[in-house]
Amino acid sequence: MEDDGGSDGGEGNGGFSPNSSFGAFADTAMDLDFMDELLFDGCWLETTDSKSLKQTEQSPSASTAMNDNSPFLCFGENPSQDNFSNEETERMFPQAEKFLLEEAEVGKSWWIAPSASEGPSSSVKERLLQAISGLNEAVQDKDFLVQIWVPIQQEGKSFLTTWAQPHLFNQEYSSLAEYRHVSETYNFPADEGMKDFVGLPGRVFLQKFPEWTPDVRFFRRDEYPRIKEAQKCDVRGSLALPVFERGSGTCLGVVEIVTTTQKMNYRQELEKMCKALEAVDLRSSSNLNTPSSEFLQVYSDFYCAALPEIKDFLATICRSYDFPLALSWAPCARQGKVGSRHSDENFSECVSTIDSACSVPDEQSKSFWEACSEHHLLQGEGIVGKAFEATKLFFVPEVATFSKTNYPLAHHAKISGLHAALAVPLKSKSGLVEFVLEFFFPKACLDTEAQQEMLKSLCVTLQQDFRSSNLFIKDLELEVVLPVRETMLFSENLLCGAETVESLTEIQMQESSWIAHMIKANEKGKDVSLSWEYQKEDPKELSSGRENSQLDPVPNNVPLEAEQLQQASTPGLRVDIGPSTESASTGGGNMLSSRRPGEKKRAKTEKTIGLEVLRQYFAGSLKDAAKSIGVCPTTLKRICRQHGIMRWPSRKIKKVGHSLKKLQLVMDSVQGAQGSIQLDSFYTSFPELNSPNMSSNGPSLKSNEQPSHLNAQTDNGIMAEENPRSPSSSCSKSSGSSNNNENTGNILVAEDADAVLKRAHSEAQLHNVNQEETKCLARTQSHKTFKEPLVLDNSSPLTGSSNTSLRARGAIKVKATFGEARIRFTLLPSWGFAELKQEIARRFNIDDISWFDLKYLDDDKEWVLLTCEADLVECIDIYRLTQTHTIKISLNEASQVKLSGSFGNTGLS
């Protein structure tokens, strides 16, 4: 603003010279009224030349407005002035008695405070106070705390604070008073682009959407930095709403409502708060607003006809699989549905449940259904949002392990006891996703194997039983999302004193062996994409440079940075990194320090658990051993592999009187990393070996009568496994998931005339899982399609006793090829087609070979499918007739998807 000869002093209201930019207006009472109205809410002034603008006498109105007790609210950013000087602003704001700036420079800016008014709405702060005061009757005799968060400027950055801001709570609840005091000590980043440690108020302020949760205790530390204080004050439910000036999209602050009660539904509180704000000429995101007509699309006959089909199909599936809940989702624009998370920008991407086309057999799940109906999702949020966005089927074994940011309904699902879920997109003939069906597996279905079997069966049912003339489920990939969380160890400087915090409660999730398959498949030349939800990190100490921090250490997930993830992954893997958090800060201070380049990660407890410790628990189940040692079963398996133990030795030996074909060989020892394990060290620990059934079938072998040749080790250092066709075969695929944990070993008693235990031979050594792969596996989660196997079976067919005797009995050399990998092994005379497939799967580390086709090279040099026993007999006959030295077999991905049989010609790929 120009000033011609400097202002004379601005008497009265501190008016400007007529030669200013407002000089076009005459010096009349109307002009003064105009200026009064212009400056009523305050404004920023800026000089455009080097002349000074002085106000030598304090304006009564300015003095009143700038006084600390006036209802004055300073906002973190001025929408009409982007380049004002923060330093100058901070210097001038405390001046309540004099407003003077000598020799103003070009571009200098300062604040003219709002004029005092006796009206009901002299400032936003006062209006907010009136708004929450209007809730007094609503929260009376209830455990509610209502507080306001507003933006402030500190050192050039914006932060949200509730210090000295309006608040309301019932004085009878001392815990709420304490939480109010705690909240005043927190500042949350409010600058655009901030993602880390912004807290609940910060997310609402930046995203301009309301957010609520039934229980803040389910938040991760980075999502809710006040988590520890909330636990102490018994705070549970929370609702936060953005506040806007009516007709403006600029967020002025956040209203937060907390309660000591778990709440699944906040519709009533949301509507009351919105009406209270509207009464003082403010607004929030409201589900009462009608969407813009340009986005609104009324249901067509197509959608109306599809809803009964979908509803009946969901009800049928729920009855067949005992599902507690099945939901149908559609874009809000298709339904003409309104919601609190809508805006003109995102309305086209918002999806919500179709309440008339859902199936809720479980009464306890109705609260979750209501929460879904109230809380809409944006495309990309949760497995439903991902299905709309990527046009894929998405399966998650545990929805409650998602962060609230990635799945806003994760907390509601946890309270409702829901776990595994599958999202299925329904496409129209145009190829667009019109609906998404969301199925929640039975609440008791927690075992990995059970989930896999149910998933396969459900996929078959979806393909075969869904009938619609306009909607289809085919040509879709399946992506399995595996959220993994692991405890971090923090070391913070609290009150200038270094204090190391010991490990807190660890939330462990067993690594799915699906991941192992994806890693192995990629090593063999297959193209695999890994989808990251949470990156798993080894426990390590992280330091904080912030003093007097209000944030106490609690379990948290701090993923690796992108370059670290890429380095940690298997070479050649294409890593698709999803949502992650970088180094975070709260209140301007660094919360966590990143790992130094080249710093070696701390080893886990595996290194402290030696072979001697493991041997003490060989007589029991792996689950019991893991519990006694103090690790999870998955970790114990990894420890065993490091010692060369591929299978847990223990099992109860029953049905020993089976034929020699079914019970052939037993391995006498295990070649560990620190030496051999002799069977006599734990052989007598199995009481079943001395049972009457044992002795009745043949002479028993005592530990001190073991033949000398049994002391020799096997070639590959692991126990020989029983024939997979044996009814007593039991493969421990999921630790702790079966009631027969004791039946997971591989010890068998051979039954022959001399009752002698023979050791197994293998021409090629089994590929051991190296430590680097283990580390990579521990921090990955996999993306897979229907082409990839869902069922795991690592049992291996039996091998003969020696190479010479095998050849003498007609053993055949086999060379198998899978991509760039090649293996050689011996086909035993006693083997059938099943044993051949099993050996190939074991050598290539394939979990389920039924997903692949076997082909052999015939006498015409053509590749012929090998699908059954008859094909194998034909292959062997050709081998003998042509007198070739080796049978050549090729392993390729199956041309058709096979889930519990086959989809037939469904087109799934």
From Swiss-Prot:
Domain RWP-RK: 595-676
Matching InterPro entries: NLP (IPR045012), NLP1-9_GAF (IPR055081), PB1-like (IPR053793), PB1_dom (IPR000270), PB1_NLP (IPR034891), RWP-RK_dom (IPR003035)
Compositionally biased residues, Low complexity: 725-745
Ranges for region Disordered: 51-71, 536-556, 568-605, 690-745
GO molecular function: DNA binding; DNA-binding transcription factor activity
GO cellular component: nucleus
Xref: Pfam families: GAF_NLP (PF22922), PB1 (PF00564), RWP-RK (PF02042)
Domain of life: Eukaryota
Signal peptide: none
Keywords tagged on the record: DNA-binding, Nucleus, Transcription, Transcription regulation
Family annotation (SUPFAM superfamilies): CAD & PB1 domains
Residue ranges constituting the PB1 domain according to the UniProt record: 811-894
Compartments it resides in: Nucleus
Biased composition regions of type Polar residues, renumbered to the chain: 55-70, 690-716
Function description: Probable transcription factor.
PANTHER family the UniProt entry points to: PROTEIN NLP1, PROTEIN NLP8
Name of this protein: Protein NLP1
